[in-house]
Amino acid sequence: LGVDLAAAKPAAYRECGCGMGPALNIAASSNAYLLADRGTWLNFRNRGELAILVQGDKRMFNQYGVMVVNPARHPHVKQALAQQFADWVLSPAGQDAIASYRIGGEPVFFPNAGS
């Protein structure tokens, strides 16, 4: 992203070692910048003066995936059910369910199976 964190760290970079919700609270209370995922941001209500400055940048793409665990290595898994779930997630119905999930009317995820 063009930011040298090693150079910025002493004065400007802060790690909280916490989840995204608490990190948003810290940013709101200290007038800070924060990289946040869309779902947590949309669900977060204690925004104070926080506002989205950048969104949709391809360099921040955060893709989720689905995979079935190898039953030969993990015989306790319910492989058939896992495969059924994976097949559904990748199907048009699953992709529709993902696309239609909203928080406050805003989409949270952008399905791209088959892209």
Residue ranges and their predicted role:
Residues 1-115:
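Exported/periplasmic ABC-transporter solute-binding proteins
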